[in-house]
Amino acid sequence: MYRQSIFTVLALFLFTLSVSAEDWPRFRGPKGSGVASGGIAVPSSWSPKANLSWKAELPGPGASSPIVVGNKAFVTCYSGYGLTQENPGEIENLIRHLVCVDMTTGKKLWQQDVKAALPEDPYSGIGVTAHGYASHTPVCDGKNVYAFFGKSGVHAFDLDGKKLWAAEVGNESDPTKWGSSSSPIEYKNMVIVTASAESQSIVGLDKATGKELWRQEAKGLDGMWGTPSLVKIDDDRTDLVMCVAKELWGLNPNNGKMRWMADATGAAQSYSSIVQDGKRVFAITGRGGGSIAVDAGGSGNVSKTNTVWTGGATASFASPVRHESKLYVVARGILTVVDTETGEQIDRIRLKGGEQTGGRFGSLDYPSPIIVGDRLFYLNGSGQMYVFELGEKLKQISLNKVTADKEVFWGTPAVSNDKLVMRSSKHLYCVSDKGQEVEADSADVEDNSESESSPQSAGGRPSGGRPTGGGSGFGGGRPSGGSRPAGGQSFDPMSMFNGLDADKDGNVTAAELSGNRMAERLKTLDKNSDDMISKEEFSTGISALFSRGGSGGSSRGGAGGGGGSSRGGGYGGRSQDNRPDRPQRPEMEK
């Protein structure tokens, strides 16, 4: 009887180690949905002096997001190299960090450091999001936490910081040298890692030992930076679903083999993650790629049988979030609302009052919106949080800042136990309702509906979207107007800038330089390391660039013309930058 009671207590103890409903254990929280199970009491307003519970200093920046399990928050960072363009330092000094912070006090409980596995891709000078040094969000199963550091591998620690194992998943480089950013997820006894840049692979690792259980290689992973999601098909089947370049894939998470695929959006890159509603999955991509809804399940090519709708709504880097029958996505300072039943655009709201983060506000939309109860929270790159009340029409409640200092926010916030956690380039912040009155910096909401003027049917794209076709940079050729001046012709810097600025937002990003053979030299014009080149930076630096003989392009860029890009977008058999010849898709399950 006594022995039986001990086993009962032990079983209960082990059960409590699992992730609770109010935890935020992975990128975008429970099931990767971006929807908080708890946290209803998270305040709608705060300031650096009100409703700020604590802030914790971080050892360096990162584009990863925080997670919260129990009373502990975890976040990854990097230091030692690539912090500034003027003085990047020595790559041998690059270190990744996993930091654990007490959720009650903000005290750092422990920090684990991982030295870079060399050779590592060098800092490009265009910002933290362009190299992947700390872009993957860790995942926790309630017992251990697993962090992916690109070429430096996957590392497992217990919740007290004890290192358990490390596993390599690849040491290759994607042609753009951007690195990967897909975050690991956990399933049964496995950690599943998408090593798109490191080995064009999806890898299943044993959570207890780090042993590789399966690996599927596919060059179709090139140009994919989103995180896969687990979709329950029925009681006996769960699919691992991801959006890659121009396709949706449904894999068997037990072995990585492909169960089904569907033609998806027109984008040659997939930055954001899918969202789901039961078995129905939604993907929204950028670069004029559009959006799609597909019912997961089946086998083989399910494009004709399972596609529910296609639409013109587009994203940039942030992933969409679903609430009831609506999808919400933020791109370039505009919040778009999409009907989940039809794919039609319901509303477009321009976010007003936002501050610039080096470049134009709205361009650095890396954080994804989240849902807490009946409110939508969106954090921009300058650390301003827009809070909306959800309903038939969106109503902006507040616009908040957590710091007056100049810090950059690239991670998606986490919500757990009535607390909201944000990471910046310097600190981890925790906001909770302390009963303090806040004079919110609210901004009026501009209704910028374009439902009548913008085509939203299949194949349409919203006004201002990038035109498709062989002439644009993503097809492999240089963007129109982006070639170097020919001999004997007058050189107009703004004409060149306008040709590179495909989305006409007044800035040139790394994505817009993709396929341009001068990309690496043009990136040096980004003097403030904000991930984009402004008109001022371009006009100031371009003449000097040409006078130094800058017309010779990078060997990583496309050769120009009809689709000769070497960036390895993973679609249509592009050059793989001397990588092994791999299949386009994972092995099909029989």
Predicted features and spans:
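Bacterial N-terminal signal peptides
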Residues: 5-18
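Noncatalytic, solvent-exposed loop/strand surfaces
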Residues: 19-487, 553-590
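Acidic Ca2+-chelating loop motifs
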Residues: 502-513, 528-538
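N-terminal hydrophobic targeting signals that begin at the initiator methionine
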Residues: 1-3
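Primarily EF-hand calcium-binding motifs
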Residues: 490-504, 518-529
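Extracytoplasmic/periplasmic, Sec-exported soluble proteins
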Residues: 58, 176, 488, 492, ...
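Generic alpha-helical secondary-structure signal
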Residues: 516, 540-541
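Short, composition-biased linear "edge" segments at structural boundaries
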Residues: 519, 544-545
